[in-house]
């Protein structure tokens, strides 16, 4: 069976493990995009350390959970967002102003919507977390 959206599956797995109360989640298959999204989440304090484990196939990420994730998910379709349009998507995906993050793919790499706004960049919405 093939996976249609590995990022959505990875974020859903993190949400489920967090809800059940696990300390560690094993996410597979691993990809560069998933690793970069995890890096942004780690930098903002939503999860602890994560490491890549080679298993001879697609790889596995071992993620330490901290209990700070209420909900996270992938944004489908990947909407193109101008630097002035972030507020519309904040209202759609986040529960309150200033609470949570939208992760955006910009020409400068993955970053949060606040960083993209301050740098004057637009991009494509990848995921949300709060």
Curated annotation (Swiss-Prot):
InterPro entries: Ribosomal_uS8, Ribosomal_uS8_CS, Ribosomal_uS8_sf. Pfam families: Ribosomal_S8. Disulfide bonds: none annotated. GO terms for molecular function: rRNA binding; structural constituent of ribosome. One of its GO terms (biological process) is translation. The keyword rRNA-binding applies. Keywords: Ribonucleoprotein, Ribosomal protein, RNA-binding, rRNA-binding. One of its GO terms (cellular component) is ribosome. The keyword RNA-binding applies. NCBIfam families: PRK04034.1. Belongs to the universal ribosomal protein uS8 family. Part of the 30S ribosomal subunit. HAMAP family: Ribosomal_uS8_A. One of the primary rRNA binding proteins, it binds directly to 16S rRNA central domain where it helps coordinate assembly of the platform of the 30S subunit. This is Small ribosomal subunit protein uS8. It comes from Methanococcus aeolicus (strain ATCC BAA-1280 / DSM 17508 / OCM 812 / Nankai-3). The lineage of its organism: Archaea, Methanobacteriati, Methanobacteriota, Methanomada group, Methanococci.
